UniProtKB/Swiss-Prot annotation:
NCBIfam families: mthyl_TIGR00027. This is Putative S-adenosyl-L-methionine-dependent methyltransferase Mjls_0079. Belongs to the UPF0677 family. Transmembrane segments: none annotated. Pfam families: LCM (PF04072). InterPro entries: Ppm1/Ppm2/Tcmp (IPR007213), SAM-dependent_MTases_sf (IPR029063), SAM_mthyl_Trfase_ML2640-like (IPR011610). It comes from Mycobacterium sp. (strain JLS). Exhibits S-adenosyl-L-methionine-dependent methyltransferase activity.
Length: 263
């Protein structure tokens, strides 16, 4: 999961990557998500975005890349939205979002009764999101548990302390988190596997064919009793009703992976 130095006073340092990802999606979707508008509307966040926009506008190639990345992020978000909603509709009642950042799915997805959503990230990021949404009067659509984890603390322990039940099936989301260095990635997936009861599901995005010899997350899951499906992201424009050559070029090596634990 993301690790940044605690104690820094700069908002750009503390939540910059999350803010910029949220802004990228909003720029493509027209910012029709009121919660995204809330998270992006604070003065210091606006300052971060304005500086970023000024830099992007100065470099045509950077502007084109920004559009490609934003388009992919928006399509990826819709894909995972549908996957999580379907899994919950089929009976799973707890979801864990890893490196949640400014994710608002606990608030905006149509969760069924009895649903619990755990969000794991740095305490600073989660506090920023909670304060912004609370001030706006937003209410979660599920039982919402922000799980703040410092860099020196095992995240599974914090998850258990927050009420997670490893004996029940779980929906895991690791959006934008992989790939990681081999040892780190293997350890993360191994921990998820150990915390997952039969019937659990996981969704994440990955990069295929870029680094020979890199740890194969889908293959690892398959070898341990997970039924795995890989969707090449270049096919997403067709799935979502969009046709964009720029998005196709950016997503040439990207894939969306979903898996269900059978054994």
């Amino acid at each position: 999961m993301r690790r940044q130095e605690a104690g820094t006073s700069s908002l750009a340092t503390r939540v910059g990557p999350e803010v910029l990802t949220t802004a990228a999606v909003a720029s493509v979707t027209g910012c029709d998500d009121p919660l995204a508008a809330v998270l992006l509307g604070r003065p210091k966040v606006i300052e971060v975005l304005q500086r970023s926009a000024e830099l992007i506008d100065r470099v045509p190639a950077l502007a084109a890349a920004h559009h490609q990345i934003a388009d992919y992020h928006a399509m990826r978000s819709r894909f995972f939205d549908a996957y999580l909603a379907d899994a919950a509709a089929e009976g799973i009642r707890q979801c864990v979002v890893l490196a949640a950042g400014l994710d608002t799915r606990a608030f905006r997805l149509p969760w069924p009764d009895g649903m619990t959503v755990f969000e794991i990230d740095q305490p600073t990021v989660l506090r920023y999101k909670e304060n912004a949404l609370t001030a706006h009067g937003a209410r979660p659509a599920a039982a919402w548990h922000p799980v703040g984890v410092e860099s020196d603390m095992p995240w599974p322990r914090r998850l258990w302390e927050s009420g997670f039940n490893h004996n029940e099936p779980t929906i895991w989301l690791a959006e934008g988190l992989l790939p990681l260095p081999d040892a780190t990635q293997d350890a993360l997936i191994s921990e998820i596997d150990g915390l997952s009861a039969a019937g659990s599901r996981i969704a994440f995005d990955d990069v295929l064919g870029m680094c020979s010899g890199r740890s194969d997350a889908p293959g690892w899951l398959t070898s341990r009793g997970w039924w795995t499906d890989v969707v090449e992201a270049r096919h997403l424009p067709g799935l979502s009703g969009r046709r964009d050559d720029d998005a196709q070029s950016y997503t040439a090596h990207a894939a969306l992976v979903t898996a269900e634990k059978i054994a």
